Amino acid sequence: MWNLIEDLKYGKIREKIVVCFLNKDIFKDDKLRLYSNQKKQVDFRNEEIVGELKSRTNKHNAYPTTFFGYNKIKYLIDEDDKRVWKFYFLFTDGLYVWTYNKDQYEVRDYQHKERGIIPQVYVDIKYLEKISSNITSNSCLPSDWEDFIN
């Protein structure tokens, strides 16, 4: 059965793993910072991007689409954030990213057992860009993670 607390813990650890990796290998000069406000609808940012991470327990191509809550996009639209919006997906076979494009997704209602009907964004996996297979949703925090995370 789905457990909210365990799901949140799992997600928070994966956020640190991904931000550490991205700061080491991609955003060396403009490091990503995790939001400390737990009420934020997105996970991290720097001067260039706003990022959201979804961690999955399947391979990237297990389904024709991947999804996340529409509240993430709605928040960024409402905030009128001018940075690039990137949605990262940590699958069992690697880290992928989708850069927001209003023509590359659809919104459909999803019946959540505990939360009722919620709008979800569905993105065709053909729009996902593979970043690396060096980290997966099964990865652990590296020993030097604190050197790369705010």
Regions found by a protein language model. Name each.
Residues 40:
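Beta-rich catalytic cores
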Residues 1-36:
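Acidic-basic catalytic patches of nuclease active cores, encompassing PD-(D/E)XK
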Residues 27, 46-49, 81-85:
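Short glycine/proline-enriched coil/turn segments at helix->beta-strand junctions
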Residues 91-150:
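Non-catalytic C-terminal interaction segments of nucleic acid-processing enzymes
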Residues 2-9, 54-104:
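Catalytic cores of nucleic-acid endonucleases
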Residues 43-45, 90-91:
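Well-ordered beta-strand positions
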Residues 22, 44-59:
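Conserved catalytic cores of phosphodiester-cleaving nucleases, focusing on short active-site segments
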